[in-house]
């Protein structure tokens, strides 16, 4: 099955809750998914460094 069709299928609401797939809402990546932000780690890092995610900042100690 083509990647684009898998992304579209994963974003649709499933008939049963157990069929839900966690995919990034921005790029469709299935791995490295962060539930709290509904995006993958790569998109999260990009958007957080640009300051587009409120309340998230780079940690330093």
Swiss-Prot record:
GO cellular component: cytoplasm; small ribosomal subunit
Keywords: Metal-binding, Ribonucleoprotein, Ribosomal protein, RNA-binding, rRNA-binding, Zinc
Pfam families documented for this protein: Ribosomal_S14
Gene3D superfamilies: 30s Ribosomal Protein S14, Chain N (4.10.830.10)
Listed cofactors: Zn(2+)
Gene Ontology biological process terms from the UniProt entry: translation
List of residues binding Zn(2+): 24, 27, 40, 43
UniProt-recorded Gene Ontology molecular function terms: rRNA binding; structural constituent of ribosome; zinc ion binding
SS bond list: none
Cofactor note: Binds 1 zinc ion per subunit.
Free-text function comment from the UniProt entry: Binds 16S rRNA, required for the assembly of 30S particles and may also be responsible for determining the conformation of the 16S rRNA at the A site.
Record's subunit section: Part of the 30S ribosomal subunit. Contacts proteins S3 and S10.
Protein family per UniProt: Belongs to the universal ribosomal protein uS14 family. Zinc-binding uS14 subfamily.
Entry protein name: Small ribosomal subunit protein uS14
Lineage: Bacteria, Pseudomonadati, Spirochaetota, Spirochaetia, Spirochaetales
Name of the coding gene: rpsZ
């Amino acid at each position: 099955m083509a990647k684009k069709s898998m992304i579209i299928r994963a974003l649709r609401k499933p008939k049963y809750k157990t069929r839900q797939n966690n995919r990034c809402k921005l790029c469709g990546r299935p791995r490295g998914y962060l539930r709290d932000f509904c995006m993958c780690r790569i998109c999260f890092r990009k958007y957080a460094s640009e300051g587009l995610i409120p309340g998230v900042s780079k940690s330093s100690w």
